[in-house]
Amino acid sequence: MANSKTAKKRAIQSEKRRQHNASRRSMLRTYVKKVIAAIKTGDHKAATEAFAVAQPIVDRMATKGLIHKNKAARQKARLNARIKALAA
C-alpha cells in the first residue's frame, strides 16, 4: 500500500489509466476481429468496409501510445494483404 499522499494519488491515477487503456485495447481488438471475420467469410466487400472502419482506429491507438506505430503499420499491412488476396 502507498505510504505517502502523492503515492496514493499516483496509484489511483495509474488504476484509472489502466482501466481506460483496457477499454480502448478491447475496442481495438474488436474492430480487428471484425475485419478478420469478414475475411474468413470470403466477402471482399464486407472485409473492405470493415477494414475502412478499423484502419483509423488502429492509427488513433498508435497516436495515443496504446500500441507502437510499427505494430499499427504491421497490422494494417497484414489485414490489407489478406483482403487483396480475396480479390485475386
From Swiss-Prot:
Keywords: Ribonucleoprotein, Ribosomal protein, RNA-binding, rRNA-binding
Family matches, as InterPro entries: Ribosomal_bS20, Ribosomal_bS20_sf
Cellular component terms per the entry's GO annotation: cytosol; small ribosomal subunit
The organism's place on the tree of life at top rank: Bacteria
UniProt-listed Pfam families: Ribosomal_S20p (PF01649)
UniProt GO BP: translation
SUPFAM superfamilies: Ribosomal protein S20 (SSF46992)
GO MF annotations in UniProt: small ribosomal subunit rRNA binding; structural constituent of ribosome
Keyword RNA-binding: yes
Residues that span the membrane, as ranges: none
Chain intervals for the UniProt region annotation (Disordered): 1-27
Family: Belongs to the bacterial ribosomal protein bS20 family.
Protein purpose: Binds directly to 16S ribosomal RNA.
PANTHER family recorded: 30S RIBOSOMAL PROTEIN S20, SMALL RIBOSOMAL SUBUNIT PROTEIN BS20C
Name of protein: Small ribosomal subunit protein bS20
Organism placement in taxonomy: Bacteria, Pseudomonadati, Pseudomonadota, Gammaproteobacteria, Alteromonadales
